[in-house]
């Protein structure tokens, strides 16, 4: 009897520990240090830079939850598309700046931004957000600045992950972009499970778009398993792409990565 009780107690401890670890919110990048980068800006003064960015987010960058707070990244940030979706905190010490950090997401590529080892080509809205009240245009008129930056957790409260199916997708070729991911913001692996099938790994394109060409027609509904790039956390968007799906459509899931505590 004592042996059975001990085994039961041990099982409960292991199970409790498992859930404590599994359900713990993402605390990614809290311990990263501030480094130096260069910034410029492009597009309209209060705009998103462009809605045709290389990452493939389209006009979503101008809407909730991104609200134009995005940036093109130089080669060290864009990382041949693997940097798409990553979030960064920036702060500026110029007299026109508030010195309070802002947060931006990488949504585009700036291949010519190589003057510094790390360079953000910000949207006009994001560049101006660094400024003191009423000083946005004066700051933008400077054109170029040095800032401090560090990697940050993406945080989109009350927003679930969405799957934006590519306009060229068909039963033999599935491709889509994942939007609104909390935490790391980008992915180490994305897998698709068609109806009655097994999970299949997708190929990351040079953007936030992932694709799969299985050689046979795929039928929905589809489960999507997402593995976060840095933390390695996994979530499954069950049935997020329905049986009767359409190319170009956006499908909203019921899941997202846990939102972390406030960063310093």
Swiss-Prot record:
<feature type="disulfide bond">
    <location>
        <begin position="92"/>
        <end position="97"/>
    </location>
</feature>
<dbReference type="InterPro" id="IPR007117">
    <property type="entry name" value="Expansin_CBD"/>
</dbReference>
<keyword id="KW-0325">Glycoprotein</keyword>
<dbReference type="InterPro" id="IPR009009">
    <property type="entry name" value="RlpA-like_DPBB"/>
</dbReference>
<dbReference type="GO" id="GO:0019953">
    <property type="term" value="P:sexual reproduction"/>
</dbReference>
<dbReference type="Pfam" id="PF03330">
    <property type="entry name" value="DPBB_1"/>
</dbReference>
<keyword id="KW-0134">Cell wall</keyword>
<feature type="disulfide bond">
    <location>
        <begin position="55"/>
        <end position="84"/>
    </location>
</feature>
<feature type="domain" description="Expansin-like EG45">
    <location>
        <begin position="52"/>
        <end position="159"/>
    </location>
</feature>
<feature type="glycosylation site" description="N-linked (GlcNAc...) asparagine">
    <location>
        <position position="30"/>
    </location>
</feature>
<dbReference type="GO" id="GO:0005576">
    <property type="term" value="C:extracellular region"/>
</dbReference>
<feature type="disulfide bond">
    <location>
        <begin position="87"/>
        <end position="154"/>
    </location>
</feature>
<keyword id="KW-0472">Membrane</keyword>
<dbReference type="GO" id="GO:0009653">
    <property type="term" value="P:anatomical structure morphogenesis"/>
</dbReference>
<keyword id="KW-1015">Disulfide bond</keyword>
<dbReference type="GO" id="GO:0016020">
    <property type="term" value="C:membrane"/>
</dbReference>
<feature type="signal peptide">
    <location>
        <begin position="1"/>
        <end position="28"/>
    </location>
</feature>
<keyword id="KW-0732">Signal</keyword>
<dbReference type="InterPro" id="IPR005795">
    <property type="entry name" value="LolPI"/>
</dbReference>
<keyword id="KW-0961">Cell wall biogenesis/degradation</keyword>
<dbReference type="InterPro" id="IPR036749">
    <property type="entry name" value="Expansin_CBD_sf"/>
</dbReference>
<dbReference type="GO" id="GO:0009828">
    <property type="term" value="P:plant-type cell wall loosening"/>
</dbReference>
<dbReference type="InterPro" id="IPR007118">
    <property type="entry name" value="Expan_Lol_pI"/>
</dbReference>
<feature type="domain" description="Expansin-like CBD">
    <location>
        <begin position="172"/>
        <end position="253"/>
    </location>
</feature>
<dbReference type="Pfam" id="PF01357">
    <property type="entry name" value="Expansin_C"/>
</dbReference>
<comment type="function">
    <text>May cause loosening and extension of plant cell walls by disrupting non-covalent bonding between cellulose microfibrils and matrix glucans. No enzymatic activity has been found.</text>
</comment>
<dbReference type="InterPro" id="IPR007112">
    <property type="entry name" value="Expansin/allergen_DPBB_dom"/>
</dbReference>
<comment type="similarity">
    <text>Belongs to the expansin family. Expansin B subfamily.</text>
</comment>
<protein>
    <recommendedName>
        <fullName>Expansin-B5</fullName>
    </recommendedName>
</protein>
<dbReference type="InterPro" id="IPR036908">
    <property type="entry name" value="RlpA-like_sf"/>
</dbReference>
<keyword id="KW-0964">Secreted</keyword>
């Amino acid at each position: 009897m004592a042996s059975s009780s001990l085994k039961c107690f041990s099982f409960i401890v292991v199970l409790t520990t498992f859930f404590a670890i599994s359900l713990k919110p993402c605390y990614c990048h809290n311990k990263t240090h501030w480094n130096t980068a260069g910034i410029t800006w492009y597009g309209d003064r209060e705009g998103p830079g462009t809605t045709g960015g290389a990452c493939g987010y389209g006009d979503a960058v101008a809407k909730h939850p991104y609200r134009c707070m995005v940036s093109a990244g130089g080669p060290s940030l864009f990382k041949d598309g693997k940097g798409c979706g990553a979030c960064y905190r920036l702060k500026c010490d110029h007299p026109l700046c508030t010195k309070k950090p802002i947060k931006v997401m990488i949504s585009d590529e700036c291949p010519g931004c190589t003057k510094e080892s790390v360079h953000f080509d910000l949207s006009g809205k994001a560049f101006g957000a660094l400024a003191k009240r009423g000083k946005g245009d004066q700051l933008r008129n400077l054109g170029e600045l040095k800032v401090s930056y560090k990697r940050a957790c993406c945080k989109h409260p009350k927003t679930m992950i969405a799957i934006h199916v590519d306009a060229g997708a068909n039963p033999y070729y599935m491709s889509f972009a994942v939007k609104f991911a909390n935490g790391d913001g980008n992915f180490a692996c994305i897998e698709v499970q068609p109806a009655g099938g097994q999970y299949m790994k997708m190929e990351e394109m040079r953007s936030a778009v992932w694709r799969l060409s299985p050689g046979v027609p795929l039928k929905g509904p589809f489960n999507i398993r997402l593995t976060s790039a840095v933390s390695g956390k996994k979530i499954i968007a069950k049935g997020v792409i329905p049986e009767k799906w359409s190319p170009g459509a956006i499908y909203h899931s019921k899941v997202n990565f846990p939102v972390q505590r406030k960063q310093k």
